[in-house]
Structure formats: structure tokens, C-alpha cells
């Protein structure tokens, strides 16, 4: 690991006076720029020590301060979409003393969480949920007869997802008291600046123009929708500038902006006006700069979205020397290689080109790589359309995000038997991002679908084989899963082999205990086998490769010639083990006394930690496997056995 210097803590005399949002209300507006600078320094220092999402939070410092100063949180509900931008919010809401535990074991979450603070009314991590949740809270307040503001802060990327527009449409129809702040940090033009634009923003959010809109609504009741549109356009012109807000106005929102999200002269009066005057749904378009105030992040916003620990002075990130190539990199290289040999191969990502490795693919095959944005549902059906026309689409998604498109997987892909390939990254525990990003369920929900081939790579060489196997398979949908992080260091073939569908492999032969692994727990199985052999328990280790179709011959062999059969997987109950147990029961292979023990993720939400610590806590490591075997045999765990020995 690169050694970083220990930088001194930043001086923050004004921030030191702020423990909770009520303290902000005591600070003069003229001192807020200093507070913003100190808050940025505190955030940069904290993330430099823990790693995390830096750029998004730096971009909303002024906005976060302004919201908490103007509104009455937690009585007023403040919801952050995704949550990458919530670090300044956490510092201002009683969690500054723990901010240097971000994303660490037993530390603060990197996202908003209801269980963590009353200032987090709704948890987040996946995108585009804030407006729906906020609308629910706004309607609940109306039903309860309570006067309460609900503010949803959503980025321009998250706004591209269909769920956000579904919520906007419903909010406009209900005319609910909801404030949506569109944080636009990817605008191609500079935000409006200067006294005139600040004046116009105040004017547009004030009582006069909001009153014009109310008159327009009443006229519409008598004169129809056409007149309403004309009034909307007239109001836009009366504001004195073209806002681009016509779409939101058509959906029933009062639109304000764009305004400079780094100017308190813009933010404070607009938020005050909206708080005091607005009725119905309001959308405030705020333009910000990702990474604002920290030069390395401003210069390379993409590289400072999510960061490792880094040196505050230089911005240099700590990087461990790799022992083996990362699974994501192996996948990307293998797919790029296959695409060079087959011009029907295309790749699809949902706003994660770097995370899935498809940026590598795109650099070689730019016309055959499609980033569809934060739109997993569309990504899957788009892939289905390509498959229907004879192409070989690889829809590369994280396991946790594939959940968002399950109906499309079932209805548009599986029922039609279309050969869409699903490379599933971030399988199993992912570490610092915690339960919201764990790849726990894909085997369970895919292997239940008729005609679906479900694979898991045991190591990086197996991953190359599975990429080629998927490219060659045209009989229906096929998936292969692999984890975050480095491989185990096996030798990589020049090109992957085409695997026989539904066939596993024996890696080590024994005769008393059988360990049947699905996925990268294979390495721990081999280590556990060393301990078991040393204890006189001859152990077979097998790599299933496939959860569907199962290798029936392999399972019969293991069941008939061993006293104990353990299945191990990096997934929830209902996955690989359930299919194995179903087969064993149907075949009568457990009637003769075979001791079968499934090892799966525990039925809890596993909190953030390093992945190896999470697997140990789950009992899915070397020591856990050895312990499970001894318990199955009714024996005490031998002294010195397992990883903990």
C-alpha cells in the first residue's frame, strides 16, 4: 500500500460552533462563505483518511448549509437521492465526531440511513428514489393535517431514470407540497452569475409570480389546457429569461432556475421565498460543480467521485500493489478479445462504464458499446431487442442494480428465451458500501427462471472461460457472476475455453467430506480441506460452476461416496444450495444418512466492513467451513484447525 503523509487537522473555528442545524441559524449570512470553506476542509480531511465519495459532497456544501439554515430539519424532511453527497449533511447534523469512521466497520454509513439519525428520514444508496419517497411523506403530512416542508435533492444523473419522472408526474397530478432541488453538476454551460440573475431568481420564486401561476390554474379550470400552456409560457417570459423548465411546468411543477448553487446570494432568498410562499410542487434547478473547492477534484471530477485514502496536499490516492488482476479488468479484457473475433458482440452498461470495465471495451469497440444512463430496466430490454435481431448483447450490471430490472429479465428476456448475456459484477459482499450494494440475491432470483443458465466464476481463469462460454451460447439467457476486487492469482489462459453447459469439476479428490463450492469461496474450500485432511478427514473439493443447470452426475458422485456434503456460496438462502437440496431429495440421495449442510449468507443485512471480515462474520471462510464439517460429524473442532488456529 502506498504510504501517505499524516496531514494536520484543518482549522475550523466557525464550524466548531455548529453541532446541529439550529446552530446555523445563529450565524450571520455574511459568514456563511467562511463556514462553507471550513466544511469543505473538514470533509476533505475526513475522506482522505477513510476513502469514500468526495466529489459529489464537495459540490453541495453551500446548498446543504442553505437548506439547513432556511428549513426546520428534522421537522421538515430532507431527502438526498443516492446519498453520495450526504457527507456535509452528516457533519452538520450531530455526526461530525464520527465523520472519520465513514464506511468503516462499526462506523458511519456512506449513505443516509434512518437508523443512524433523525435527520435522515429516508435511507438511500440506489438512485432516483428521493422524489417518490418525498411525495409519500408530503401526502402523509397533508393527511395528518401537519404543516411540513419536504425537500428532495436529486442529481441530474439520477433524474434520467424513469422512476424519477414517474414520481414527478404523480406529484404534479396530486399538487402536493413538495420541493425538488435538481442538483445539476454536469451542465455544459456555466451557471448564471451576477446581480441581475440573482434578482431574477428572487423574483421568480417570490409571491407575485407564484400568484400569477395560481391565477393561471384557476383560469384553466374554465378555459382548458391550451390556455394553461399559454399562461405558463407567458410566466416564463415574465421571469425575463429562458429557464428550460417547460417540461417540469407541464408536469405541474413551478420551476425556478437555473441558479448558482455556490452562491448564498442566490440560494438563501430563493429558498426563503419557496418556504414562505410556495404552494404545490416546486422544482429548483441548481447548478453546481462536482469537487468544488478542492483543486484535484475539480480537475478530475470522475476520478474523485469515489476515492481511496489520499494525500490532501497532492491529491495522490493510496493504492495497494495488486497481487493479481481485478475480476472486473479480467472480464473487460476477455470481452474485448471476444468482440475482436465476433462482430455481433455488443456491450451495455447503465451509467457504470468504469465500474464494469466497459470503458476498456469502448476504447477498442466504440460503436458497439452503449451507456444507457441510470436505466437498468431499459438496459435489459434494449439488450433483448438486440438479441432478437441476432446480436450478442452483454448487459454488464452490478448484482445489486440488476435487481432494479427483474421484471424485464423475466418478461422481456427469459420468457422469450432471448440469448442476452448478463455479466454480474460485485457478486457477494462488497465491503464499505454495506448492505445496499451487496450482491446477495442474483443467484436466487435468476436460477428460479426456466431456461436460464446461471454460472459463477471460482477464479479469474474461470471468468475468462465463462466470458467465452456466454459468447458462444445462443440457446437462451445466460449469466455469470464475479466479485469486486482482485483475483486469486491463478495463471490466465491466452483465451477462455468454451465450458460444457451444466458441468462442474473436481479440484481435489478425497473420500469422506465433500465441499461443493459455487463461486470464489473455492479458495477457502481448498484451505479448509488442508485442515480437514490434517485432522484425518479426507476431503474432496469441487467447483460447481453452474447453479443452473446443475451437474447431476457430479452431485450424485459426491453424495454417494462421502459422509458429509457441504455446499458453499456467496449468496442468500434460496440460491445454489436450494437447487442442490431439491435434486438430492428428488433422487432419494439423502435417505441413506448423508449429512448435507448448506452454507449461505446469513438472513440478516450485513453491515459494512472489509469483505474478508464480512465473510468471516458470516461463517463463509476457511474457519467457518471447517467448523461446519465438525458440527455435521458431531465432533468437536480440533485445536489449531482453520484460519483462526
Swiss-Prot record:
Cofactor binding: number and manner: Binds 1 Mg(2+) ion per subunit.
Cysteines engaged in disulfide bonds, as pairs: none
Pfam families: DXP_synthase_N, Transket_pyr, Transketolase_C
A GO BP entry: thiamine biosynthetic process
Catalysis: reaction(s): D-glyceraldehyde 3-phosphate + pyruvate + H(+) = 1-deoxy-D-xylulose 5-phosphate + CO2
Cited HAMAP family: DXP_synth (MF_00315)
Name of the protein described by the UniProt record: 1-deoxy-D-xylulose-5-phosphate synthase
Organism: Rhizobium meliloti (strain 1021) (Ensifer meliloti)
Amino acid at each position: 500500500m502506498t504510504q501517505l503523509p499524516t496531514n494536520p487537522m484543518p482549522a475550523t473555528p466557525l464550524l466548531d460552533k455548529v453541532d446541529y442545524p439550529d446552530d446555523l441559524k445563529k450565524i450571520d449570512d455574511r459568514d456563511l462563505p467562511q463556514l462553507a470553506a471550513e466544511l469543505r476542509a473538514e470533509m476533505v480531511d475526513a475522506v482522505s483518511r477513510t476513502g469514500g465519495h468526495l466529489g459529489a459532497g464537495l459540490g453541495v456544501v453551500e446548498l446543504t448549509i442553505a437548506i439547513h439554515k432556511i428549513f426546520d430539519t428534522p421537522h421538515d424532511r430532507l431527502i438526498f437521492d443516492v446519498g453520495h453527497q450526504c457527507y456535509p449533511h452528516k457533519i452538520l447534523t450531530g455526526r461530525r465526531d464520527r465523520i472519520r469512521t465513514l464506511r468503516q466497520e462499526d462506523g458511519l454509513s456512506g449513505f443516509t440511513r434512518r437508523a443512524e439519525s433523525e435527520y435522515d428520514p429516508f435511507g438511500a444508496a440506489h438512485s432516483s428514489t428521493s422524489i417518490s419517497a418525498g411525495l409519500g411523506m408530503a401526502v402523509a403530512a397533508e393527511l395528518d393535517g401537519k404543516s411540513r416542508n419536504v425537500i428532495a435533492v436529486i442529481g441530474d444523473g439520477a433524474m434520467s431514470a424513469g422512476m424519477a419522472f414517474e414520481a414527478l408526474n404523480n406529484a404534479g397530478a396530486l399538487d402536493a407540497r413538495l420541493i425538488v432541488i435538481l442538483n445539476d453538476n454536469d451542465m455544459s454551460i456555466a451557471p448564471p452569475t451576477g446581480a441581475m440573475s440573482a434578482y431574477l431568481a428572487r423574483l421568480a420564486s417570490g409571491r407575485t409570480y407564484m400568484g400569477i401561476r395560481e391565477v393561471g390554474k384557476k383560469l384553466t379550470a374554465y378555459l382548458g389546457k391550451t390556455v394553461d400552456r399559454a399562461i405558463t409560457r407567458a410566466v416564463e417570459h415574465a421571469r425575463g429569461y429562458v429557464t428550460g423548465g417547460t417540461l417540469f411546468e407541464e408536469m405541474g411543477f413551478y420551476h425556478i432556475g437555473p441558479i448558482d448553487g455556490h452562491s448564498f446570494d442566490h440560494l438563501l432568498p430563493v429558498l426563503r421565498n419557496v418556504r414562505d410562499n410556495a404552494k404545490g410542487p416546486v422544482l429548483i434547478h441548481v447548478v453546481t460543480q462536482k469537487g468544488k473547492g478542492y483543486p484535484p477534484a475539480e480537475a478530475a471530477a470522475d476520478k474523485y467521485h469515489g476515492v481511496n485514502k489520499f494525500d490532501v496536499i497532492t491529491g495522490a490516492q493510496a493504492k495497494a500493489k495488486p497481487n493479481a488482476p481485478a475480476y472486473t479488468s479480467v472480464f473487460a479484457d476477455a470481452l474485448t478479445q471476444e468482440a475482436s473475433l465476433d462482430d455481433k458482440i455488443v456491450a451495455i452498461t447503465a451509467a457504470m462504464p468504469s465500474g464494469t470495465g466497459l470503458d476498456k471495451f469502448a476504447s477498442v469497440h466504440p460503436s458497439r458499446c452503449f451507456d444507457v444512463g441510470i436505466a437498468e430496466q431499459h438496459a435489459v430490454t434494449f439488450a433483448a431487442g438486440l438479441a432478437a435481431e441476432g446480436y450478442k448483447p452483454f448487459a454488464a450490471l452490478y448484482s445489486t442494480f440488476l435487481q432494479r430490472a427483474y421484471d424485464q429479465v423475466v418478461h422481456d428476456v427469459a420468457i422469450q428465451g432471448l440469448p442476452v448475456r448478463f455479466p454480474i459484477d460485485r457478486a457477494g459482499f462488497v465491503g464499505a458500501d454495506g448492505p445496499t450494494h451487496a450482491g446477495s440475491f442474483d443467484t436466487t432470483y435468476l436460477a428460479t427462471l426456466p431456461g436460464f443458465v446461471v454460472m459463477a466464476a471460482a477464479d479469474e481463469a474461470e471468468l475468462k472461460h465463462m466470458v467465452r462460454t456466454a459468447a458462444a451460447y445462443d440457446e437462451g439467457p445466460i449469466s455469470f457472476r464475479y466479485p469486486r476486487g482482485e483475483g486469486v492469482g491463478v495463471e490466465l489462459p491466452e483465451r477462455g475455453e468454451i465450458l460444457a453447459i451444466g458441468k462442474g469439476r473436481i479440484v481435489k479428490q478425497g473420500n469422506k467430506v465433500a465441499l461443493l463450492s459455487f463461486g470464489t469461496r473455492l479458495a477457502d474450500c481448498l484451505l479448509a480441506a488442508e485442515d480437514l485432511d490434517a485432522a484425518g478427514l479426507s476431503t474432496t473439493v469441487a467447483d460447481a460452476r453452474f447453479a443452473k443447470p446443475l451437474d447431476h452426475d457430479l452431485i450424485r458422485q459426491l453424495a454417494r461416496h462421502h459422509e458429509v456434503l457441504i455446499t458453499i456460496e456467496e449468496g442468500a438462502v434460496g440460491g445454489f444450495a436450494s437447487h442442490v437440496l431439491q435434486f438430492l431429495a428428488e433422487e432419494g440421495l439423502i435417505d441413506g444418512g448423508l449429512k448435507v449442510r448448506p452454507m449461505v449468507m446469513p438472513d440478516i443485512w450485513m453491515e459494512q466492513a472489509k469483505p474478508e471480515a464480512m465473510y468471516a462474520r458470516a461463517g463463509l471462510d476457511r474457519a467457518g467451513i471447517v467448523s461446519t464439517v465438525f458440527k455435521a460429524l458431531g465432533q468437536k473442532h480440533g485445536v489449531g484447525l482453520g484460519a483462526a488456529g
